[in-house]
């Protein structure tokens, strides 16, 4: 199982938000490419980049940093935030992204995944599903949909999504542990790999995810606040 450090960018800084709230940050650091390098030096085999400005404003803002990290990190990079069109996704793949993460737009219009998979291949498409109280939420967690994660997950898998990034919003950024059940349901019901995110605070949390068969776990706040040592975490889940 992969342990994938998050490098979330806002206003050209590396940040970690509490419950996705742009006004509530518990980490704010300069020079995202340097941070990315630090995680790779500690053993990260993949990086998770998020353009938070893009996610909140609907357009990509941190391309310069993203391109620098792709060029200099030496590991595959998955990228999300502000990817609202096929053109955006193709652009990032051409720049060297291993996977592009599509969120809201895929849930609202699953057909876009079919079209995109024909252009760039399923293996490059990761769909981001965020769930709150058992239902998928979109538009920066502001809007609730009628779908459960498994319902929309099956539709997106059929359309050509290559993997799912699943965030249980109820535990995201709060640093109080994980609820494994919603992720387990996805792993049990879908064929494509599931990458989990949200609420990991201990190596024990990571081992629980490993046990249910996720492909990887994105870690953010816990490594920035030194609750988890990345090297130890990678070693523990090998």
Swiss-Prot record:
Keywords: Amino-acid biosynthesis, Cytoplasm, Histidine biosynthesis, Isomerase. It is an enzyme of class 5 (isomerase). Its EC number is 5.3.1.16. Pathway: Amino-acid biosynthesis; L-histidine biosynthesis; L-histidine from 5-phospho-alpha-D-ribose 1-diphosphate: step 4/9. One of its GO terms (molecular function) is 1-(5-phosphoribosyl)-5-[(5-phosphoribosylamino)methylideneamino]imidazole-4-carboxamide isomerase activity. One of its GO terms (biological process) is L-tryptophan biosynthetic process. This is 1-(5-phosphoribosyl)-5-[(5-phosphoribosylamino)methylideneamino] imidazole-4-carboxamide isomerase. Belongs to the HisA/HisF family. InterPro entries: Aldolase_TIM, His_biosynth, HisA_bact_arch, Isoase_HisA-like, Isoase_HisA-like_bact, RibuloseP-bd_barrel. It holds the Pfam family His_biosynth. One of its GO terms (cellular component) is cytoplasm. The active site is at residues 8, 130. It catalyses: 1-(5-phospho-beta-D-ribosyl)-5-[(5-phospho-beta-D-ribosylamino)methylideneamino]imidazole-4-carboxamide = 5-[(5-phospho-1-deoxy-D-ribulos-1-ylimino)methylamino]-1-(5-phospho-beta-D-ribosyl)imidazole-4-carboxamide. It is found in: Cytoplasm. Gene3D superfamilies: Aldolase class I. The keyword Amino-acid biosynthesis applies.
